[in-house]
């Protein structure tokens, strides 16, 4: 089980999420359920550079897209950037992008190799 830490910068309408350790599907499901019951921002930055996603399966990623679609109306038009640390995490994040498109999740998702690229795409300035 991994660790997910969440920080908010409400002036920038930004949530920064950092995942570390060996992640399982329930880590993400629990975070998603908790997030959408609380403070929701228009832009979200996921930092998974120190996360190990090797336990996740394609079905887990598809299920995440379905679960998120049912909860995410409040983020319509928003953006989520995922910063990855290696080829596995980048590929899985790209797969998540595709599943979110298929499920018509109401916000954009894109994977990046650096936080700077992600923040630029999110439109967040220091």
Predicted features along the sequence, with ranges:
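Amphipathic, Lys/Arg-enriched alpha-helical "gate/interface" segment within cytosolic domains
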Residues: 2-126
């Amino acid at each position: 089980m991994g660790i997910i830490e969440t920080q908010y910068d409400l002036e920038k309408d930004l949530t920064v999420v950092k995942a570390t350790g060996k992640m399982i599907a329930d880590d993400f499901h629990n975070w998603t359920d908790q997030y959408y019951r609380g403070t929701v921002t228009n832009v979200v930055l996921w930092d998974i550079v120190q996360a190990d996603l090797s336990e996740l399966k394609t079905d887990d990623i598809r299920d995440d897209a379905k679960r998120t679609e049912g909860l995410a109306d409040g983020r319509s038009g928003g953006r989520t950037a995922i910063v990855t640390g290696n080829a596995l995490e980048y590929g899985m994040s790209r797969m998540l992008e595709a599943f979110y498109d298929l499920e018509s999740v109401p916000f954009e998702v894109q994977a990046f190799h650096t936080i700077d690229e992600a923040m630029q795409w999110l439109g967040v300035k220091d």
